[in-house]
């Protein structure tokens, strides 16, 4: 099930909550101490003002200005199941690496964007796709919320019939805002025809290995593994190795000439247009997984680029199947009427 894939994140969130609770107790003690120091200085200032103090008001003022309250701990978050865009903006301020929005049934999320008063939600998620945009929200009740790094991933499932009803309006140019094309890891698997009962003990070693990889990625300092930091750049970045760059150039040339210039369904072409960034993104993810599993750092490897290219080929067949639900909708309607 979908939830099985999220168990490592759930484990990380439990550990983050335990750490947050421990830091919260220390914060409360530190806050009491800071308040006591502040009260003591206030008392001393009153005495200085009345001429009975041992120190000058200026020295006490300097100490008050230098007095710092302890930083309130922030709980690390990795995912959410339901949040308004205002609350999501606040969570992203506290978790600038981004968040995963998980819904078992995505149709509920999509439908919520059509409700009166929630019209801006859809635009918010469209803007969050790049992963490096900033966002400013101004509300009378909440005031101004500035989110430096707008980065949200969406994960969930949807039934083909409900997906079709959502895709049909997107065929209209005015309603095709590119949201569906941004769901780049769309998969539409075959139904299992020859079902068999499989009753096996899970591979605990593999499960623990997967968790360790995800935990290392969550806390990884990428600059220690070959990422470059430059002035003016908000994020460190990695290059392809020479071999991987050659493969990417060949793959991109094939995409531009063989796939994007053919007479194909327009929404499919728009979807494939997003692959220009999908392939290197998948290569980077694959490379970092290898690094977290013990491989050496450095440029994104040829092996990671090959995996990414193969994954894009795999996803292409699923994309065609998804859009095939509505590609010939006019002919299907005519056949039904006939």
Q: Model-found features: residue ranges?
A:
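Phosphate-handling catalytic cores of nucleic-acid transaction enzymes
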Residues: 1-338
């Amino acid at each position: 099930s979908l939830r099985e894939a999220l168990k490592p994140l759930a484990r990380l969130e439990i550990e983050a909550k335990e750490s947050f609770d421990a830091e919260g107790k220390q914060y409360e003690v530190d806050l009491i101490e800071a308040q006591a120091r502040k009260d003591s200085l206030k008392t001393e200032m009153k005495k200085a003002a009345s001429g009975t103090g041992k120190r000058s008001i200026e020295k006490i003022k300097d100490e008050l200005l230098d007095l710092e309250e302890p930083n309130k701990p922030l709980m690390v978050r990795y995912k959410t199941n339901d949040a308004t865009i205002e609350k999501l903006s606040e969570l992203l301020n506290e978790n600038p690496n981004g968040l995963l929005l998980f819904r078992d049934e995505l149709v509920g999320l999509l439908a919520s964007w059509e409700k009166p008063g929630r019209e801006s939600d859809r635009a918010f998620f469209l803007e969050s796709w790049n992963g490096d945009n900033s966002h400013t929200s101004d509300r009378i009740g909440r005031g101004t919320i500035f989110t430096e790094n707008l980065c949200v991933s969406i994960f969930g499932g949807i039934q083909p019939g409900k997906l079709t009803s959502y895709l049909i309006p997107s065929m209209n140019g005015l309603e095709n805002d590119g949201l569906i094309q941004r769901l780049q890891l769309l998969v539409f698997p075959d139904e299992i025809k020859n079902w068999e009962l499989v009753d096996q003990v899970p591979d605990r070693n593999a499960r623990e290995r997967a968790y360790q990889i995800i935990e290392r990625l969550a806390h990884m300092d990428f600059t220690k593994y070959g990422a470059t930091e430059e002035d003016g750049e908000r994020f460190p970045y990695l290059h392809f190795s020479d071999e991987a760059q050659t493969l990417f150039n060949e793959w991109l040339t094939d995409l531009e000439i063989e796939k994007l210039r053919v007479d194909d369904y327009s929404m499919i072409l728009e979807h494939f247009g997003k692959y220009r960034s999908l392939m290197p993104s998948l290569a980077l993810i694959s490379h970092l997984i290898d690094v977290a599993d013990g491989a050496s750092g450095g440029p994104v490897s040829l092996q990671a680029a090959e995996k990414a290219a193969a994954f894009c080929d795999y996803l292409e067949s699923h994309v065609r199947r998804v859009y095939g639900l509505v590609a010939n909708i006019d002919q299907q309607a005519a056949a039904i009427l006939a």
